[in-house]
Amino acid sequence: PTIILMFGDHQPSVEQEFLDKAYGVTQDQMTMEQYMGKYKTPFLIWANYDLPDDEIPTTSLNFLGQYLLSYAGIENSLYENYLQNFQEVLPAMTFVGYIDQNGKAYSHLEQNEYTTLIEDYRTLAYDNLFGGHSRHAQYYQAPQ
């Protein structure tokens, strides 16, 4: 069996004047939803076996691996379970901001009910990527 995930990591660069006309507002007048929309890119998961016909809702790059593991039938680590639960509350998160389960977009500069949740996520993601010897490996390993 083969499964492939393809995605774009950014939209092509275009002049700001073009974007202002396309959105009908200048960048400083955009809503957070419009601003985050500038960074949307398509993705595709393909396999040489049947995949569920489920439509994947709004998501972000940091969560695509969850779908890939699920479709491949691979059991989650504790960290991946955490990401799955996190995504139910905040289904998309980028360097610009994040979107909650109701579709409302927020800037990372805002302090709100999600601030602590995001700080916890960042701590765990940092530990996973850069924890070195202090990394809590058992949290990130796939079950045996």
Model-identified regions with their sequence ranges:
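Solvent-exposed soluble domains appended to multi-pass membrane proteins
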Residues: 1-144
